[in-house]
Structures are given as C-alpha cells and as structure tokens.
UniProtKB/Swiss-Prot annotation:
This is Translation initiation factor IF-3. GO terms for biological process: ribosome disassembly. It is found in: Cytoplasm. The keyword Cytoplasm applies. It comes from Shewanella woodyi (strain ATCC 51908 / MS32). Belongs to the IF-3 family. Its main location: cytoplasm. Monomer. NCBIfam families: infC. IF-3 binds to the 30S ribosomal subunit and shifts the equilibrium between 70S ribosomes and their 50S and 30S subunits in favor of the free subunits, thus enhancing the availability of 30S subunits on which protein synthesis initiation begins. GO terms for cellular component: cytosol; membrane. Keywords: Cytoplasm, Initiation factor, Protein biosynthesis. It holds the Pfam family IF3_N. GO terms for molecular function: ribosome binding; translation initiation factor activity.
Length: 180
C-alpha cells in the first residue's frame, strides 16, 4: 500500500465514493437525511452517481456502517464557514493596566478614568496599580482612598475582581466589565 503525502493538507476525515472499501453492506441515508435502508455498497454508489453527488461514510464503526448521499464539497465548505464564524465570535480578554500615584491631580485622574472606562467598554479587564515612593509608604490610607474612589466611580460598568491589596511598594486592584 502506497502512503500518500499530504503536503500541509489534512486528510479527509470521511471516506467518500470509491474510497469506501472492505464493506459489503451499508445503511444509507438520502440527500435530505431520510433513511433509505440497507443495501450493498455498489447499489449505494449507483444511487449517488444517479443523483450527481457523493456517497460519504458518516459512521464507519456502526454495524453496518452508515453512509449518506450528499454534495461533499458543499458539506466541507459549510463546515469550514461555520468554524470561521465561531472563531470570529471568540473574544480574547486582555488585562490593561493603568498606573496611578497617591498625588495624582484631578485632571490626570479624569483622563485615566476615561481610559479605564474605554477598556472596560471594550470588554477587557483593567488592572489599577497605585505606586508609592519613599515617604508615601507612611500614608497608604490616601492611596487606598484613591482606589476606593476609582471603584465607586466605575461601579456602574465594572465589578471588582480582586480588591485593593498591597504588593510590595504598590497597591493593586483588578476590575472586570459587568455582564450585560
């Protein structure tokens, strides 16, 4: 038996037409899926030829194997099209980070809040990092108040996934968009 090379192509998952061998009898389904009963493989191939379509082995492990009369090219096209549609609908959620400081001014705060709003509207998670430097570590309560203010300002569109906590010299909070 000669082994076929499939240069990058995937072999057909179903045997079709003359490739269905080693079987004497099959259970056949018609074009619309209606059962046509048991018949020999030769009769099934003749029916498929008369209809101008392919004989496709659907369930090779059944006893007797199940075959169907269908346009195999159209079947593969529709299958590939539906897989593309499913892939298109998948959304990869990213975690976007915005960095604040305890002394962030009101204007800068509003700009960063707008960016957080945009990230959450796009369906991404947002990581809010508040960095403390030097003596600011003595006033961590100011930083926690700022994180709580952010949480309150975004309460309508975001849910807190991980509450503010200290990690070394920075406080971190993760926000996730609310389900619609």
């Amino acid at each position: 038996m000669k082994i076929k090379k499939t240069a990058g192509r995937q072999a057909a998952p179903n045997r079709i037409n003359e490739l269905i061998t080693g079987i004497s009898e099959v259970r056949l389904n018609g074009l619309d899926g209606e059962p046509l009963g048991l018949m020999t493989i030769r009769e099934a191939q003749e029916l498929a030829d008369e209809a101008g379509v392919d004989l496709v082995e659907i369930s090779p492990n059944a006893e007797p194997p199940v075959c169907r009369i269908m346009d195999y090219g159209k079947f593969l096209f529709d299958k590939a099209k539906s897989q593309k549609e499913q892939k298109k609908k998948q959304k990869i959620v990213q975690v976007k980070e915005i960095k604040f400081r305890p002394g962030t001014d009101e204007n800068d705060y509003q700009v960063k809040l707008r960016n957080l709003n945009r990230f959450l509207d796009d369906g991404d998670k947002a990581k809010v990092t508040l960095r403390f430097r030097g003596r600011e570590m003595a006033h961590q309560s100011l930083g926690m108040n700022l994180l709580n203010r952010i949480k309150d300002d975004l309460a309508e569109i975001a849910v807190v996934e991980s509450f503010p906590k200290m990690e070394g010299r920075q406080a971190v909070m993760v926000l996730a968009p609310k389900k619609k």
